[in-house]
Amino acid sequence: MRVLAAMSGGVDSAVAAARAVAAGHDVVGVHLALSAEPGTLRTGSRGCCSKEDAGDARRAADVLGIPFYVWDFADRFKEDVIDDFVASYAAGETPNPCLRCNEKIKFAALADRAIALGFDAVATGHYAQLENGVLRRAVDADKDQSYVLGVLTAEQLSRAMFPVGDTPKDRIREEAAERGLAVANKPDSHDICFIPSGDTRAFLGAHIGVRPGSVVDADSGEVLAEHEGVHGFTIGQRKGLGVQGPAADGQPRYVTSIEPETGTVRVGSARDLEVHAITADRAVWTSGRAPSGPVECTVQVRAHGGLAEAVAEAVDGGIRISLREPLTGVAKGQAAVLYRTDPAGDIVLGSGTISGTDARPNTQ
């Protein structure tokens, strides 16, 4: 097969490309330039799309003996990822930009160009397992990235390859060193690549501006503080509320709801965060078709953690999810990714974007 290897400049994508070469594929490496202004992306060894990373990717391609190119996706990235991120926060949601990048850039815009140029698949360094269209969790549970791939359609999965998902991260680093790849010990990236300072609130403030509102006690309705915009808050947040002292019962306060229309941020106790039911829109099913009835599954609502046993049902292009046990910190805009337990690695069934929650179990 002709394989386009998306090379971020990190160790995982370098080994993914190396494995594609070793498997006998005709491989070409590509690095995505995601900003028209390089200074707006993080620099240094911890980036995933910084200007230094392009050099690391090129050097890895040279070691592997494969052609290498840099493709400019800055405009698409701004429109589909950065602008979406800002708009979502302004609407009181909590988006995951890596998830959107996979959905709109790596496995859409990039994959479309690859197919148009005669490639059969795009290989990345994501930690997930994919075989015959079935997407599973990675062997290395600590590095599993199936959650941020749960938005991919059956068509997108049909042209994807994840060569490192069957191997623990420590072994990937060892393999990189054995192959003479200089990125073998390069630190992992963790933060949002287009926020170089790591200060998400400041970034959003610069893009959205001041939209004042009130922090209100969820029980009494008392105004506790003023704020400069709902984009500075997320469900379950405890710090940075601008509120002096604990609640009346002596317990910490948490953000329990965000109302962008009025600029109201409500805070309450930990018990007010419990969610028993979730509704999600923009449903995607990895099999290509929605299930005909209720499905026993596990739902994950954050990239790390937020797991619960559940029953999910496809409803009007969305998903209704009833939880077997409550979850906390569930925010609109997050993805709800559904899994079926399997000894070979839990299988991703599909996903939806959380549009609502309920403290009461679904009864329908």
Swiss-Prot record:
GO terms for molecular function: ATP binding; tRNA binding; tRNA-uridine 2-sulfurtransferase activity. Its EC number is 2.8.1.13. Keywords: ATP-binding, Cytoplasm, Disulfide bond, Nucleotide-binding, RNA-binding, Transferase, tRNA processing, tRNA-binding. Residues 143-145 are annotated as: Interaction with tRNA. It is found in: Cytoplasm. Pfam families: tRNA_Me_trans (PF03054), tRNA_Me_trans_C (PF20258), tRNA_Me_trans_M (PF20259). The record marks 126, 334 as: Interaction with tRNA. One of its GO terms (biological process) is tRNA wobble position uridine thiolation. GO terms for cellular component: cytoplasm. The keyword S-adenosyl-L-methionine does not apply. Catalyzes the 2-thiolation of uridine at the wobble position (U34) of tRNA, leading to the formation of s(2)U34. This is tRNA-specific 2-thiouridylase MnmA. The lineage of its organism: Bacteria, Bacillati, Actinomycetota, Actinomycetes, Mycobacteriales.
